[in-house]
Amino acid sequence: MSVPEVQWAQVVEKAGTPPVYKQVPVPKPGPDEILVKMRYSGVCHTDLHAMKGDWPLPSKMPLIGGHEGAGVVVAKGELVKDEDFKIGDRAGIKWLNGSCLSCEMCMQADEPLCPHASLSGYTVDGTFQQYTIGKAALASKIPDNVPLDAAAPILCAGITVYKGLKESGARPGQTVAIVGAGGGLGSLAQQYAKAMGLRTIAIDSGDEKKAMCEQLGAEVFIDFSKSADVVADVKAATPGGLGAHAVILLAVAEKPFQQATEYVRSHGSVVAIGLPANAFLKAPVFTTVVRMINIKGSYVGNRQDGVEALDFFARGLIKAPFKKAPLQDLPQIFELMGQGKIAGRYVLEIPE
């Protein structure tokens, strides 16, 4: 396949400034890398943080964001075997762009925790461009029966919430409270939870998000902006008023992280996934100990988690709710995201 020398991309020139739609050189893959012609890229709240530069994690600048890219392999390095990727294969570029594959973390299938990991759209350029590079070992193969536009959100949001649900330890028939249920991660978390046999309580705000959550199978929707007592409402929605077996925190504000231990049941798990800037997670030591509450973080997923998350979609168990928009509209999408006005996920159409 012929590859041009230049391409269109959304480039953040300086942290805190909106991306600029401009032409940049097309990167060339290294020996162990693939070059993917992007068809679609999801827009994640992480991309907004990368633009703002408000995380305690240095990013490259200028930066091409994005880490939910789905497309077709158009070039590859000499070390990439055909059984891994051939020219023309469908491929996904995820948040974890590459890792060393030889440290203790990588050896025990915790590649996201690799101290040498490269992160798409953060420490290396990501998927808000026509052509993106990724390490072949970490890229995802997208099944032929999964549409590329629908696959894009699965590559980060889907994998992340699927991993978080596994980390929660919740078993079929048990109840999971999903905080931020109406967003891109939350809309997928509800579906993965249902497919895993879990019952869900959706916590978010707004009529549009309520309608979407109910359509996705939430047994109860709690609007935190209208509720006089979120803790009491969650408990009231569970058998015996004992609280949720697990809480999945996808929120981008600090308060839900302080509140979750109040409505998780004894011996339950609070799983922190959302990353509000400059926030802290606090809980009373006495209550946490005597109620045996498990508080943990869950960070994206490893290669096998990615395979499993895509397989759920391929088997028709997940329907990613998303809206399409052209790559040129990214700044406006960031504005809506910052205002909390997006239900589901936006997927960018990358120009040919």
Curated annotation (Swiss-Prot):
Q: Which amino acid positions bind Zn(2+) 1, per UniProt?
A: 44, 67, 156
Q: Any keyword Oxidoreductase?
A: yes
Which E.C. number(s) belong to this protein?
A: 1.1.1.1
Alphabetical UniProt keywords: Cytoplasm, Metal-binding, NAD, Oxidoreductase, Zinc
Cofactor notes: Binds 2 Zn(2+) ions per subunit.
Q: Which cofactor does it need?
A: Zn(2+)
Reaction(s) catalysed by this chain, per the record, are: a primary alcohol + NAD(+) = an aldehyde + NADH + H(+); a secondary alcohol + NAD(+) = a ketone + NADH + H(+)
Q: So where does Zn(2+) 2 get bound?
A: 100, 103, 106, 114
Please name the SMART domains in this protein's record. Answer: PKS_ER (SM00829)
Q: Name one GO cellular component term.
A: cytoplasm
Q: Where is the signal peptide?
A: none
User: Source organism's superkingdom?
Assistant: Eukaryota
Q: What is its main location?
A: cytoplasm
GO terms, molecular function? alcohol dehydrogenase (NAD+) activity; zinc ion binding
Query: Which positions in this protein are listed as binding NAD(+)?
Result: 180-186, 204, 209, 273-275, 345
Give the subcellular location. Cytoplasm
Similarity comment:
Belongs to the zinc-containing alcohol dehydrogenase family.
Subunit: Homotetramer.
User: What name has this protein been given in UniProt?
Assistant: Alcohol dehydrogenase 3
Its encoding gene is what?
alcC
